[in-house]
């Protein structure tokens, strides 16, 4: 398979996808992309996987569409048994490969862990997840243990200007115009 590269492990790892089940007998694998455009995952190289706590760099040899799936062939993975060993491995790159964003645009990874407060100063909790819906993204906020409204989790639409009033990544805070009772 591929050689282990400890010196070239990702400094700031970010998961862009996951390897699925093997396809055929020649080492092809299904791949599930988390990028906005599924094929964009192939723009980011090199890929890393983590096996037994060690980073390994894997080289993409080829990829193609098969029905609704994307399938990949990795260098050195030439049979079904080798491919099966990679099933469910996350595809990781160094976040320095991601392009710079315009003002007002954010990578989900940068919003994770941010404290969310209302425009009135009520502390809603911390961002623990993001969801993509048909119309807009939604931030999942884990409420503080002693939340006055007894809410454990809040779903707040990420609508810049309407709901999201200010994002300050330096202080890790997001200000929202949102009723704490929701």
From Swiss-Prot:
PRC barrel domain: residues covered: 103-182
GO molecular function: ribosome binding
UniProt subcellular location: Cytoplasm
Any single Gene Ontology cellular-component annotation: cytoplasm
UniProt keyword annotation of rRNA processing present: yes
Membrane-crossing segments per the record: none
SUPFAM superfamilies: PRC-barrel domain (SSF50346), Translation proteins (SSF50447)
Keyword annotations: Chaperone, Cytoplasm, Ribosome biogenesis, rRNA processing
One example of a Gene Ontology biological process annotation: ribosomal small subunit biogenesis
Pfam family, one: RimM
Quaternary structure and interacting proteins, as annotated: Binds ribosomal protein uS19.
The protein's role, per its UniProt record: An accessory protein needed during the final step in the assembly of 30S ribosomal subunit, possibly for assembly of the head region. Essential for efficient processing of 16S rRNA. May be needed both before and after RbfA during the maturation of 16S rRNA. It has affinity for free ribosomal 30S subunits but not for 70S ribosomes.
Domain statement: The PRC barrel domain binds ribosomal protein uS19.
Family label: Belongs to the RimM family.
Protein name (Swiss-Prot/TrEMBL): Ribosome maturation factor RimM
Biological source species: Citrobacter koseri (strain ATCC BAA-895 / CDC 4225-83 / SGSC4696)
Gene: rimM
């Amino acid at each position: 398979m591929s050689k282990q590269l400890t010196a070239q492990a990702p400094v700031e790892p970010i998961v862009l996808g996951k390897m699925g089940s093997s396809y055929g007998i020649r080492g092809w694998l299904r791949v599930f992309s988390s990028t906005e455009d599924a094929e964009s995952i192939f723009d980011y190289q090199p890929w890393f996987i983590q096996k037994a706590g060690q980073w390994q760099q894997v080289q993409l040899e080829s990829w193609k569409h098969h029905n609704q799936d994307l399938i990949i062939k990795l260098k050195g993975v030439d049979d079904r048994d080798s491919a099966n060993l990679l099933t469910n491995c996350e595809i990781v790159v160094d976040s320095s490969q991601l392009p710079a964003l315009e003002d007002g645009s954010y990578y989900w990874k940068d919003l994770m862990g941010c404290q969310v407060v209302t425009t009135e100063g009520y502390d809603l909790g911390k961002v623990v997840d993001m969801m993509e819906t048909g119309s807009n993204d939604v931030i999942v906020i884990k409420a503080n243990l002693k939340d006055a409204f007894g809410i454990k989790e809040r779903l707040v639409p990420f609508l810049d200007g309407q709901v999201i009033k200010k994002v300050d990544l330096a202080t890790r805070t997001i200000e929202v115009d949102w009723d704490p009772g929701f």
